[in-house]
Amino acid sequence: MKRLFLLLITLPLLLCGCGEPNATQTIFAMDTVMTFQVWGTDAPQAVQRISHTISDLESCYNREGLARGAADPAVLQEALDLSRRTGGAFDPQLGSVTALWNFTAEDPKIPTAEQVRDALQEKTWDLGGALKGYAGQKCADILKEMQIDRAILNLGGNVQTYGQKRDGTPWQVGIQNPQGGDPVGILAVEGTASVVTSGDYQRFFEMDGVRYHHILDPKTGYPARSGLHSVTVICRDGMTADCLSTALFVMGLEQGSAFWRESRDFEAVFLTEDGKIYATQGASLSGCDYEVIRR
């Protein structure tokens, strides 16, 4: 059995025109490595507040925090609203199923069909598909409150940009290549936004030549088989971006494109298993050949 758990899921960041940040910090939280780069007079204090906020959110929304009722009911309601919006493709109540698969275990096992069926009935909370996006949004609120000039926060697969670069050009965020190496393309991101990627290469194990990844289909309780390697979502709201990246991966290219056409609050880039790239018409993508998804 081959097992891979990427602790650091980095979208390459090209920060041309910003100069050296006034404060930088790297922490381990929410099962990943996070790096904060902040520009501004109060940057050191901002980095400290961000770090504490991430820690507080993790303790409130991890399995233990959810069990003791530490989560904000409004956040849980927003997660349920996003689940309804996506027709259940994103489901924040797959906690028992996620625990059953246990992708972070040293020796993960494939559960039986009966175990999966029973776990699907339990409906326990798991905010893993929303929490980093929500955290990025909360951090952006802190940066605004502190009147920080600009920042870029890499939350392990989630990138939160804040403010404008000094030279006026967009932030440049690379989309990770599932095979490693250079990014498959570069997104130009204006101002404050959340860029979130969900991919089958981020956390998985292989058994008998089959890859079992951590993005579960809520209808089956098994890893989604949608023909995609990854989906990247660009959105002004971090939690929405996080949830939609998971939902679109589960939906697949055709259904995900139709969902985008009915929406107005995000853009997306789809990377298929056969190596093709599709980007919605509002996504500013360069450095690769791709097909545009139009309304």
Briefly describe each language-model feature range.
Residues 2-295:
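Mature catalytic core of soluble alpha/beta enzymes
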